[in-house]
């Protein structure tokens, strides 16, 4: 089962609504679902809360170290409470997935994501779960930093919010350790296609 849920982002109001904070948005949704409130804990360099699910302690964490030092926070909590890498799920923004979609993944490269890069380094492994929340790609590599540090368009933000809400439905499976069911649910829960416009009532053409 997942014992540590981590949402990645940058602290501070100037970053709150930027694409890079998608992981924070998801973790906030998890906290609401579990009726939990996070509080700053300097020992773990982040906003933290502990809940009990079916007799098991579960931790929620939002590192407050800035993105490129996220691993410092994750490793501090995981090591103290003896949480194994495969019991950790990290939610983060993903350039290679369109807004409105998410993917669950175990292990693999950090793909240039500085938060994941530092978690890899601090844990000494890439063998942890990631929830990849699509934010889309600007189309030009040189614009990536500006892209993730800006607010998404209203349409993209709505799609991302809906995606986060759908991903929350997999939470019981994540907590139970049924990663296959969680993966299936997250990967198949795509936004519904918009309905085609209703045809207008028109009079028949006059011959």
From Swiss-Prot:
GO terms for cellular component: cytoplasm. TRNA binds at residues 15, 66, 68, 114. One of its GO terms (biological process) is rescue of stalled ribosome. Residues 188-207 are annotated as: Disordered. GO terms for molecular function: peptidyl-tRNA hydrolase activity; tRNA binding. It is found in: Cytoplasm. The record marks 93 as: Stabilizes the basic form of H active site to accept a proton. It catalyses: an N-acyl-L-alpha-aminoacyl-tRNA + H2O = an N-acyl-L-amino acid + a tRNA + H(+). Its main location: cytoplasm. It is an enzyme of class 3 (hydrolase). It holds the Pfam family Pept_tRNA_hydro. The active site is at residue 20. Keywords: Cytoplasm, Hydrolase, RNA-binding, tRNA-binding. CDD domains: PTH. Its EC number is 3.1.1.29. The record marks 10 as: Discriminates between blocked and unblocked aminoacyl-tRNA. Monomer. Belongs to the PTH family. Hydrolyzes ribosome-free peptidyl-tRNAs (with 1 or more amino acids incorporated), which drop off the ribosome during protein synthesis, or as a result of ribosome stalling. This is Peptidyl-tRNA hydrolase. It comes from Albidiferax ferrireducens (strain ATCC BAA-621 / DSM 15236 / T118) (Rhodoferax ferrireducens).
């Amino acid at each position: 089962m997942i014992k540590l849920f981590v949402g990645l982002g940058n602290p501070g109001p100037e970053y709150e609504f930027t694409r890079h904070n998608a992981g924070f948005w998801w973790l906030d949704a998890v906290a609401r679902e579990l009726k939990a409130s996070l509080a700053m804990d300097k020992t773990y360099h982040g906003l933290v809360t502990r809940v009990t699910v079916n007799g098991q302690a579960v931790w929620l964490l939002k590192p407050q170290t800035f993105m490129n030092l996220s691993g410092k926070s994750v490793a501090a909590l995981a090591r103290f409470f003896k949480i194994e890498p495969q019991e950790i799920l990290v939610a983060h923004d993903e350039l290679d997935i369109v807004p409105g979609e998410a993917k669950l993944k175990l292990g693999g490269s950090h793909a240039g994501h500085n938060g994941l890069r530092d978690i890899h380094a601090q844990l000494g492994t890439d063998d942890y779960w990631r929830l990849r929340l699509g934010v889309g790609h600007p189309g030009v590599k040189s614009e990536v930093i500006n892209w993730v540090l800006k607010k998404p368009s209203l349409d993209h933000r709505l799609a991302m919010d809906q995606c986060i809400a759908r991903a929350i439905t997999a939470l019981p499976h994540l907590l139970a350790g049924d990663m296959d069911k969680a993966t299936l649910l997250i990967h198949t829960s795509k936004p519904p296609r918009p309905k085609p416009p209703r045809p207008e009532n028109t009079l028949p053409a006059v011959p």
